Amino acid sequence: MSFKLNSFVAAALFTSLCATSLPALAADPAAALAALQNNVQSLGPNGEKPESASTITLSDTELAKIKAMNATAAIVFHYTGNDWAKAQTAGLKAQFAKMGIKVIGVTDAGFKPEKQVADIETMLAQKPSIIVSIPADPAATASAYKAAAAQGVKLVFMDNVPKGMQAGKDYVSVVSADNYGNGVAAAHLMAQALKSEGDIGIVFHAADFFVTRQRYDAFKKTIKETYPKINIVAEQGIGGPDFTGDADKAASAMLTSHRKIKGIWAVWDGPAEGVIAAARTAGRDDLVITTIDLGENVAIDMARGGFVKGLGAQRPYDQGVTEALLAGYGLLGKAAPPYVALPALPVTKKNLIDAWQTVYRVPATNKIKSSMR
């Protein structure tokens, strides 16, 4: 899971732009899913058009210059307790090592803005050349990031940018998965599993979190505009920090109040685990769940032929590599695109093993492999 960006205003702008600039989606879920992997549908937090991550490169000469700088980097997370953050860290560290850049710290704010501000201040005391980060709150953390920029630190952001900061001036760039595209993918996967009809529920993130808002907007818009026989009959927001437990309660209430519900979408894999728990408790072995983010627990459920029939996956390892390369752009004073994105990856049981390798750059875990039926 990745998250947090500007505001619902930015999200609304994004949704409006998508409505006018994107082609109409196909009514056939399989065809629509195939098309998703060839383009990025998300726009940046300020409406920027995406630049492909494949265009971000450094020459041998540029790498040599960076190595001679003996630069250091800090990685400041909003939260590290998931596979997404671990893969991001792995990608960042691997690419930084190739660039001769030492990682001096990785921090976890536990989704608390005040903790992240303290983490930034702690890292700044060590005078890093680079900070790669995802803000826990775009407004509450902005002053700390501005202080880092004023100190001359090269900032690269994951998914989200602090309020009042400008690309090319205050930070190098922001790198994101195609979160809107992954929301679209989850909608088509839901339709595919339900044969394009039935009642469904939505468990969304009840916070000013641009990335999760993109997912929600995309899922809901795609269902409403593309599948007229699928009815969204219940929606419930969750605020955390126990997202799995909150989703369990939300889904349980939906299953009790709307007994004809055939499917529930959860905004990322942690909440999806809560929906799985609710379905088990309710004895709803027929419930279809789709989500976003390829975590091990939802992958195991999918491998077993369980509740999770499909999900949209990010590419966090490659995202980390791209962020490290862009940090190199910052050190060199090389012009960088303001928003860089990686395409969505629809995942079902059929391509699960290969998708895990694509997402994490390591083979699927033994638990996943042994769960395949």
Features from the language model and the residues they span:
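A residue-level marker of the well-folded mature domains of exported/periplasmic proteins
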Residues: 4, 25-373
